[in-house]
Design a protein with these regions (language model features):
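Active-site groove signature of glycoside hydrolases
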Residues: 107-124, 146, 152
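Short helix-capping segments at alpha-helix termini
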Residues: 65-68, 142-148, 172-178, 241-244, ...
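A short acidic, helix-capping loop that chelates divalent metal ions and anchors anionic groups
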Residues: 39-45, 79-85, 121-125, 189-190, ...
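A short, acidic, flexible beta-alpha connecting loop/helix-capping segment that sits on the rim
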Residues: 10, 249-262
């Protein structure tokens, strides 16, 4: 399997283009760009400057020069614009963001677009899933045309918390361009049996987020790989059982002071664990 680095790990220390090169220097084969927020620049056609086609092409060029891939795009901006929102205008904005991200991903050479999906408090999980499925059915033709995959992540929200929830969403959308981005750390923090989840999801998993969790003063906190509660031998066994050999994307936040150290320690831990 190949290792990828999510931008949250390193971009507090390095700007995007340098971060991509640094990821390669640290022994990673991929980089996940997080489109985290649009700030005050608007929506839809008004993408922030760093995420315009010209800048995304620059990121792809930096990755090629460094000898790594842009493995995926993460639409972190969806934490602001929920595709499950009861507000039709917000849903429309989220839909347009998701649709347009397909072209950006293709330009970057990324095959996967991570969709972190929140659930508004006033909706039941069933209502939120219905809204999400409607949005994704609208968007998947763009992904199919671009040759990329929208991957719904288990971020801990009730609408997509379990393997069965994720299978329902993917089955209802019914497109090869809609699959699952499984986060082993999030699943562990929610009490899931990760190996069983992964085997149930099987080939629907197109990418994995890897991070660890530990409890500190009663709170769950993200930890370096191997320093928390995740059953890593179980993760490795499940990967073998389902034939997963894609990217493992590290998502352990680093500060300007700790970014390199966190990336190296997590890389080494994953290799020691045989993942």
């Amino acid at each position: 399997m190949k290792l990828s680095l999510h931008s949250i790990c390193i971009e507090r220390k390095y700007p995007l283009l340098r971060a991509i090169g640094r990821a390669a220097e640290l022994g990673y084969q991929g980089y996940e760009i997080d489109i985290g927020d649009f700030g005050d620049t608007g929506l839809g056609l008004h993408w922030p400057e760093e995420y315009t086609p010209e800048h995304v092409a620059g990121a792809a060029g930096a990755a090629h020069a460094a000898g790594i891939e842009i493995s995926s795009l993460c639409l972190g901006v969806l934490w602001r614009f929920y595709p499950t929102s009861p507000d039709a205008a917000v849903r429309a904005q989220a839909t347009e963001i998701i649709r347009q991200s397909a072209g950006l991903a293709a330009l970057a050479g990324a095959k996967v677009i991570l969709l972190p999906i929140g659930q508004p408090e006033m909706l039941t999980p069933e209502q939120a899933r219905d809204s999400l499925v409607d949005v994704l059915r609208t968007c998947v033709p763009e992904a199919e045309k671009a040759g990329v995959i929208y991957a719904v992540e288990n971020v801990g929200q009730a609408l997509a918390r379990t393997a069965d929830n994720l299978i329902e969403i993917v089955s209802r959308v019914d497109s090869p361009a809609c699959q699952v981005y499984y986060d082993v750390g999030n699943a562990t923090s929610q009490g899931a049996e990760v190996g069983a989840d992964m085997r149930k999801l099987g080939k629907r998993i197109v990418m994995l987020h890897v991070k660890d969790f530990q409890r500190t003063a009663g709170r769950r906190e993200v930890a370096v790989i191997g320093e928390g509660a995740v059953d890593w031998p179980g993760v490795a066994a499940a990967c073998r059982d389902i034939g997963y050999d894609g990217f493992l994307t590290l998502e352990v936040p680093g500060t300007a002071e700790t970014a390199d150290d966190v990336a190296v320690r997590s890389r080494d831990a994953l290799r020691r664990l045989g993942i």
